[in-house]
Amino acid sequence: MTAVEYIELSGVPESRWPNFREWFKWHQDNYLVGIAKDGDKISGVAVARCLHEGEEPVHYVHRQDGNTAFVDLTVTSTDGSSTPYSRLAMKTLLSILWSRFGPRKNIVFNRGGKRKVYDYMKFMRKALL
């Protein structure tokens, strides 16, 4: 199963966009996709990019020098359940994000069209313990 298929199987709203595969490919081509695996099996996928603080998260924009990590999408199960396995996948995805972007000022999650803003370092300390 590919990362795109994993997201589509989860049924998240983004997977039903008419341009979803194009959108995903752009992020993947720009190294903005994290994939957590358990052996050969995908256990989670995240799409994230950097923006300047307060900048509108317009699609197809990534600012390497941005001080905000904007997480467009996270999927850690295909059935929407939260389990110890899905929580471990989320920790893995956050570790990938840290490796890719390093420390930032904020981390923003897009959850159902609503944005949740957190202090990056405080969030990572809590999430990765």
Predicted regions and their residues:
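A broad, low-specificity signal for short, low-complexity segments enriched in glycine/proline
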Residues: 5-10, 32-40, 64-69
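Polar/charged alpha-helical tracts
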Residues: 18, 22-29, 95, 99
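Acyl-donor binding region in acyl/amide transferases
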Residues: 56-125
